[in-house]
């Protein structure tokens, strides 16, 4: 199991944790439904970060490459206190430090899927709609310290 670190949030633009906190403070925030971030693997160069935004009824998961660029993002919404649903996944491709292509998948519980491919240079947006089986998009809400189900890259 990879080491886990906590902070108030992850600052994407600067690639740093804001207000690191110890486990007891993070646990208290979790129990109170207050936001906090989970850094997986390292406090300074994590491979993944999880934004526990229970006050907004959502969880964000960002996967970082070796250069700290967020190449994959998942967004889950709380359906109730016990279950999450994956509503959005975004995959980004980079050329040096700039995103050149982003593909976003927007899911709903009824099985509707919207796929948006955004080419950034030159700008072009493609969008298609489809259907999918939503069964695999449900996850149990994580207990404090148990984030393994959220860290699955291949969904």
Residue ranges of model-derived segments:
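N-terminal interaction modules that seed assembly of large macromolecular complexes
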Residues: 24-52
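Beta-turn initiation residues at beta-strand->coil junctions
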Residues: 50-55, 62, 72-80, 103-106, ...
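Generic beta-strand structural signal
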Residues: 41-43, 64-66, 91-93, 107
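Long amphipathic alpha-helical scaffold regions
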Residues: 76-97
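A structural detector for short beta-strand units
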Residues: 32-40, 58-64, 101-105
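Residue-level signal for glycine
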Residues: 44, 56-58, 68, 81-83, ...
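Long terminal segments
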Residues: 1-33, 90-155
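A short glycine-rich beta-turn/N-cap micro-motif
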Residues: 43-48, 67-72, 97-101, 110-114
């Amino acid at each position: 199991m990879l080491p886990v670190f906590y902070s108030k949030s992850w600052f994407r633009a600067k690639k740093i944790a804001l207000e690191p906190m110890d486990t007891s403070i993070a646990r208290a925030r979790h129990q109170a439904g207050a936001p906090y971030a989970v850094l997986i693997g390292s406090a300074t160069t994590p491979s993944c970060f999880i934004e526990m935004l229970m006050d907004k009824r959502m969880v964000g998961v960002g996967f970082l490459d070796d250069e700290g660029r967020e190449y994959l993002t998942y967004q889950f919404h709380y359906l109730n206190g016990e279950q999450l649903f994956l509503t959005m996944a975004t995959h980004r491709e980079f050329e040096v430090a700039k995103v050149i292509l982003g593909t976003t998948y927007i899911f709903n519980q009824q099985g509707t899927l919207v796929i948006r491919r955004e080419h950034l240079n030159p700008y072009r947006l493609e969008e298609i709609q489809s259907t999918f089986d939503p069964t695999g998009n449900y996850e149990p809400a994580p207990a404090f310290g148990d984030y393994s189900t959220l860290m699955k890259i291949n969904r």
